[in-house]
Structure formats: structure tokens, C-alpha cells
């Protein structure tokens, strides 16, 4: 008798995706982050669901409802901080996952890569709207500053901003719609994740060498289920350590002050995972230019397949390109640091130089170093 998992219409899909899936025998721990992102999404949806049961999306009660969750709801403080720090873990996994894709040339799976970019935008939008919901000072002013950027769009900008706000400023209508979008987007992300996996399983996984691994495959279960389990336990350990020992480490103290439209905080800044893009935005004195740089700082990921000049897929055997990659990583850390600093000397010039370097490495230095490597190998 054939095993039910191989014949049942639903179980068959799960079987082909997570059990009998042929996987390369040499994929490293950098391939764990896909499953960790799935876990993060599940944690966020579950904690978010329980938070939504107690939250009210009204400007007069939003801040109080979050306080009520932390003080009066059974383990409400834990759910709230798991959700807030779960977002940080989500982005750590996201950035690592994208970095892995760049390092090992996984971007050559075009459909998978492009769906991944859409997923990145969707998760960033979700996180931004979630940050507005507690209705603290940084929530309110963050929402005001970021939505206001759309007014830089010629001709329709101002109308567009007022349409998103639902009025002439960030107010009750804005909070209500942000809550609605924040609730629905994770489910859209989950659906897109399935499409992401569907396209990945059309080609099979890449591997560190970047070579074809058809001749050497192993079943996903038990080898990679057990390997993923180790990643899961480590992620949960870090998340719980962060949540239980220093839950506010990555947050902003200003968000414990209720939103006040009459009082601007001295330094408006987003959560840490947006700081690199925020630094690029601030480094350009022109408003429209800044907005375009902000969008292209993420959208530039779509250019990676077009800029792939090397005859090898992975960076594993390409020391020059490896140097460029790690300079890019260091540059992103620099941008993240600058994004959290006030707009004054020397931070302005450091931010501008780091922004120029970011685009230069991706658009010029990485393709050029690939071509130099090709020449050195006489290809």
C-alpha cells in the first residue's frame, strides 16, 4: 500500500515541499533563514491576533489600550513584547536571507528573487504601519514624516498624502486604516511566501558552490528538518532572551509618551531596521531626490540579476567580489548607525559618503570586480 502522504491531494503537496523534497547535500546554515522567516511570520500572526483582541484603533484610546494589554491582560506584556521584538528578529532573518541570496548568486532564480523583493516591500509596509498603532510620540511623528514623503511626487503628491491620511493630518482615520492594513498584510505575505516557495521548487535550491547539484541530492526530511530545528531553537532563544531581559532595548523611549501633534520630538527616527534607508533618504538635500533614493535603495535588489557579470554563480571562489560584498555589509552597518544620529556635522557627510558608496558598490564595483576575476581566470 502506498503511503497516504504520497497519494492524498493535500498531504502530497506538503510531502513534495517539506518531506521528500530533493535538496542539495551541501547547503550550509545560511539556508536556514527561509524556514526561520516562516516561523517569524507565524509568531507575528499569532501574537498579533491576541493583541488585536484587546487593542482599539481610536486615537483617544489606542495608547491606553496598549497600556491595558501590558498591565491587565494575562501575560499581555509578554505577547506585546514578543510581537515587538519578533519584528526585529524577522528583519534580522530577512536581511541575512537577502545577503545570502546576493553572496551565493541565488538571485539568478528570477521569479523567486522578484517575489522575494515584493515580500520585502510588503513586510516593510506591515512593520511601518504596526509601529504607528501604539500611538506614542514616535508612532505619530514617524507616520507624519514618512507619509509626508509622498507629497514630493509631482502634481498628485499633496492629494495623495491627504487621501492616505483620510484628512488634513495624521488622525483617527489614518490610525483606523493603518490597523486594518496591518491586520490584512501578514496574510498577503503568507500567500506570497507560498508563491515564493512554488517558484523555488520549480528550480530546486541553490548551494554554496553555485554548481549544479542534481547528481547529489538528499531528502529534506530528516536531514534539513533537523537542521532547521536547531535554527528554530536558536531563534527562539534569542527572541526570549531579548523579550524577557531587555524588551525595550530596540524600542524608542519617546513612544511611551502619548502622541501629541503640538509637540515634536527632538529626533524623529524609525525602528532600527529602517535606519539604513532613512540615512539614505536624509543624505540627499532635495525632497524628491531623497524619496527616489529611498525607494531605489531597496528596488536596486532587482538589478542584481542584470549586473551579474561573472562566469561563476557564487562568490565562494571569488575573493575580490567577496571583499566588495563585505564592504557593502560594513557600509549598511554604517548607514544604520548614521540613521539614528542627529542631522549635524560630522554625521551628515558620513551619511552622504556611505550612501554614495552603497550605490557605487552595487552598480559599479561589484560588476567590475566580476569582470576582473573573469579576466584573471582567462574566461
From Swiss-Prot:
GO cellular component terms attached to this protein's record = mitochondrial inner membrane; respiratory chain complex III
In this chain, a ubiquinone is annotated as bound at 201
Q: What is this protein called?
A: Cytochrome b
Q: Which family does it belong to?
A: Belongs to the cytochrome b family.
UniProt xrefs under Pfam families: Cytochrom_B_C, Cytochrome_B
Q: Which organism is it from?
A: Chrysochloris asiatica
Q: Is-annotated flag, keyword Signal?
A: no
Top-down, what is the taxonomic lineage of the species of origin? Eukaryota, Metazoa, Chordata, Craniata, Vertebrata
- Co-factor requirement: heme b
The remark listed among the other comments is: Heme 1 (or BL or b562) is low-potential and absorbs at about 562 nm, and heme 2 (or BH or b566) is high-potential and absorbs at about 566 nm.
Localization annotation: Mitochondrion inner membrane
Which residues span the membrane? 33-53, 77-98, 113-133, 178-198, 226-246, 288-308, 320-340, 347-367
One Gene Ontology biological process: mitochondrial electron transport, ubiquinol to cytochrome c
Q: Where do the coiled-coil regions begin and end?
A: none
**What is known about its subunit structure?**
The cytochrome bc1 complex contains 11 subunits: 3 respiratory subunits (MT-CYB, CYC1 and UQCRFS1), 2 core proteins (UQCRC1 and UQCRC2) and 6 low-molecular weight proteins (UQCRH/QCR6, UQCRB/QCR7, UQCRQ/QCR8, UQCR10/QCR9, UQCR11/QCR10 and a cleavage product of UQCRFS1). This cytochrome bc1 complex then forms a dimer.
Name of encoding gene: MT-CYB
Residues annotated to bind heme b b562: 83, 182
Give an example GO molecular function: ubiquinol-cytochrome-c reductase activity
Amino acids binding heme b b566: 97, 196
UniProt remark on cofactor binding: Binds 2 heme b groups non-covalently.
Q: Which UniProt keywords apply?
A: Electron transport, Heme, Iron, Membrane, Metal-binding, Mitochondrion, Mitochondrion inner membrane, Respiratory chain, Transmembrane, Transmembrane helix, Transport, Ubiquinone
| Organism domain of life | Eukaryota
Purpose of the protein: Component of the ubiquinol-cytochrome c reductase complex (complex III or cytochrome b-c1 complex) that is part of the mitochondrial respiratory chain. The b-c1 complex mediates electron transfer from ubiquinol to cytochrome c. Contributes to the generation of a proton gradient across the mitochondrial membrane that is then used for ATP synthesis.
Does the record bear Metal-binding in its keywords?
Answer: yes
Question: Which InterPro entries does the entry mention?
Answer: Cyt_b/b6_C (IPR005798), Cyt_b/b6_C_sf (IPR036150), Cyt_b/b6_N (IPR005797), Cytb/b6-like_sf (IPR027387), Cytochrome_b (IPR030689), Cytochrome_b_C_euk/bac (IPR048260), Cytochrome_b_N_euk/bac (IPR048259), Di-haem_cyt_TM (IPR016174)
The membrane topology term of the UniProt record is: Multi-pass membrane protein
Amino acid at each position: 500500500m502506498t503511503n497516504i502522504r504520497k497519494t492524498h491531494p493535500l498531504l502530497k503537496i506538503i510531502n513534495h515541499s517539506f518531506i521528500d523534497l530533493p535538496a542539495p547535500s551541501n547547503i550550509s546554515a545560511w539556508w536556514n533563514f527561509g524556514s526561520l522567516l516562516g516561523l517569524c511570520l507565524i509568531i507575528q500572526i499569532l501574537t498579533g491576533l491576541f493583541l488585536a483582541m484587546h487593542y482599539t484603533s481610536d486615537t483617544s484610546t489606542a495608547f491606553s489600550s496598549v497600556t491595558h494589554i501590558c498591565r491587565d491582560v494575562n501575560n499581555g506584556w509578554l505577547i506585546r513584547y514578543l510581537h515587538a521584538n519578533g519584528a526585529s528578529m524577522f528583519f534580522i532573518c530577512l536581511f541575512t536571507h537577502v545577503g545570502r541570496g546576493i553572496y551565493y548568486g541565488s538571485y539568478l532564480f528570477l521569479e523567486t528573487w522578484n517575489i522575494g523583493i515584493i515580500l520585502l516591500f510588503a513586510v516593510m509596509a506591515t512593520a511601518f504601519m504596526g509601529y504607528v498603532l501604539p500611538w506614542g510620540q514616535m508612532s505619530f511623528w514617524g507616520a507624519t514624516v514618512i507619509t509626508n514623503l509622498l507629497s514630493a511626487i509631482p502634481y498628485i503628491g499633496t492629494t495623495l498624502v491627504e487621501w492616505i491620511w483620510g484628512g488634513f493630518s495624521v488622525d483617527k482615520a489614518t490610525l483606523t486604516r493603518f490597523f486594518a492594513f496591518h491586520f490584512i498584510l501578514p496574510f498577503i505575505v503568507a500567500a506570497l511566501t507560498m508563491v515564493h516557495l512554488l517558484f523555488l521548487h520549480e528550480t530546486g535550491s541553490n548551494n554554496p558552490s553555485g554548481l549544479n547539484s542534481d547528481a547529489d541530492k538528499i531528502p529534506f526530511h530528516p536531514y534539513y528538518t533537523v537542521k532547521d530545528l536547531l535554527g528554530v531553537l536558536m531563534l527562539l532563544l534569542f527572541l526570549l532572551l531579548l523579550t524577557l531581559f531587555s524588551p525595550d532595548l530596540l524600542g524608542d523611549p519617546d513612544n511611551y509618551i502619548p502622541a501629541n501633534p503640538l509637540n515634536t520630538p527632538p529626533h524623529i527616527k524609525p525602528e532600527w531596521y529602517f535606519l539604513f534607508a532613512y540615512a539614505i533618504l536624509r543624505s540627499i538635500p532635495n525632497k524628491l531626490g531623497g524619496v527616489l533614493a529611498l525607494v531605489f535603495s531597496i528596488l536596486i535588489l532587482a538589478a542584481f540579476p542584470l549586473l551579474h557579470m561573472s562566469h561563476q554563480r557564487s562568490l565562494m571562489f571569488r575573493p575580490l567580489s567577496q571583499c566588495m560584498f563585505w564592504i557593502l555589509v560594513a557600509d549598511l552597518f554604517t548607514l544604520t548607525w548614521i540613521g539614528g544620529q542627529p542631522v549635524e556635522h560630522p554625521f551628515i557627510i558620513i551619511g552622504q559618503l556611505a550612501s554614495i558608496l552603497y550605490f557605487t558598490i552595487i552598480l559599479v564595483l561589484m560588476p567590475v570586480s566580476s569582470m576582473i576575476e573573469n579576466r584573471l581566470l582567462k574566461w
